[in-house]
């Protein structure tokens, strides 16, 4: 026992250096006094560079979730150049799925580059915007109710971008949701909403500090109402009348060609109009035709706009000009429904 104890103590004793002799090497030291002409890496798989544009794009899509806003911004700038080459390929699906959530990005410059990217996608192929209408509506609604005031104020710009390229699909798919979201962004409480006065105060304060962004959201609201409440143009109807004999044998242009049969739609009773029902019950209402959209707008949203717009007209400026045009649009919609 005494011998083992002595050996253990020697392990922790520091050996004294002797004069003229070098320091003793450690027991686990690695000898590096050799020269190698080649180094072999057994796990190396990539030996040559690739020029595949789609493969490079897929690698860059993962950077959309990078923690650095500069990296996310530069990735979106690169995608703007690459979109015309890959918009009709399989990578377009992953591109849209990776970029659309950036509508709620906290950085302003990232949102600006995403807006440019969506504009490029719509210019190259508007059908891609129509195909991804559901996630676009989902994240636009999330941006309109976001806790960040900057994300809320920029939601109107994304709405205008989608209106330019797939406006008719947007008004049919999310008429009530977009109107409710825009009123929330502008700070206008709605009657019958679950949280009518919950977030109105903060939105009003933030909007008054950013008159230019308020002007953009008012313009987005005007464009959305004008497109949703207008009847189809006479020229478009005349163009559809010529191939009426064989049109029923072709692929439909609208997403729900048999909606007029109302097979999966809950109809309201004849004595209960859509405008008379609470606002939170209109989420299940199908707004495929302009008449239904006008009834919903006149019953739930027109009184709110008519009460809020005159004060903006008195303030003048760009907001006052858009507010005056909105008041004229309200009268036009009222006359069209009469």
Curated annotation (Swiss-Prot):
Keyword Methyltransferase: no
Cell compartments where the protein resides: Nucleus
Keyword Metal-binding carried by entry: no
Leader sequence segment: none
Keywords: Nucleus, Ribosome biogenesis, rRNA processing
Gene Ontology biological process terms in this record: maturation of LSU-rRNA from tricistronic rRNA transcript (SSU-rRNA, 5.8S rRNA, LSU-rRNA); pre-replicative complex assembly involved in nuclear cell cycle DNA replication; regulation of DNA-templated DNA replication initiation; ribosomal large subunit assembly; rRNA processing
One GO CC annotation: nucleoplasm
Main location: nucleus
Classification via InterPro entries: ARM-type_fold, Ipi1_N
UniProt GO MF annotations: chromatin binding
Region (Disordered): 1-25
Origin superkingdom: Eukaryota
Known partners and oligomeric status: Component of the RIX1 complex, composed of IPI1, RIX1/IPI2 and IPI3 in a 1:2:2 stoichiometry. The complex interacts (via RIX1) with MDN1 (via its hexameric AAA ATPase ring) and the pre-60S ribosome particles.
Family: Belongs to the IPI1/TEX10 family.
Function comment: Component of the RIX1 complex required for processing of ITS2 sequences from 35S pre-rRNA.
Name of protein: Pre-rRNA-processing protein IPI1
Gene source species: Eremothecium gossypii (strain ATCC 10895 / CBS 109.51 / FGSC 9923 / NRRL Y-1056)
